[in-house]
Amino acid sequence: MDLYGRKDPSKSGNWFSTSRTALMDVFKSTSDSISDEVADLFAEHKKEYRRVRDEVNAKYQNLISELNNSVMDKTFQGSLADYKKQYNKLVSAMNDERDYMARNIMGGGIGNLEDIYDALSGGVFRDKGTVMYGHGSSYYRSQESRVHETIANYAALSITRPDLIELLKADKPDLVAELDATIVELLKKVGDG
């Protein structure tokens, strides 16, 4: 919605969120610190991610080993191309299942919250491994990119995980207040169009 809330949606730039001086000012003045409660959540999430990752990897490594063994003991029915196709299919399924499960750990949405904190840090948190999700410093060179990602993730969490919004609000009350105000204004603009 932020993209389409521009003054002229047919032209690039001048997104609704970054055209709001109040949001840009609050964003610039918001600390990139992480409260203990949020840091504990991220640590728990990382631990659970590793468990899920290891579980999914083990499941598919067993299937890949069975496939490889069938080639070695000559019980595999098919050509080398058939083997490669089945192998690639297993690897793809492993990656898809791991990604799906990782995004839904602990009710989902924690990656969105991590992305917000990564944006506040200018990508440093992802670069240093403080968070698992985000874009890193090369993406966040521009303040506008940070704001765009923050508003997108905030809007998603507002719908799917209001409990995580409350956690962010406890840590960054001024930012949350301005994000809420921005979304209200954007919804008014969309309603007028």
What kind of region is each of these model predictions?
Residues M1-G193:
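Active-site-flanking segments in enzyme catalytic domains
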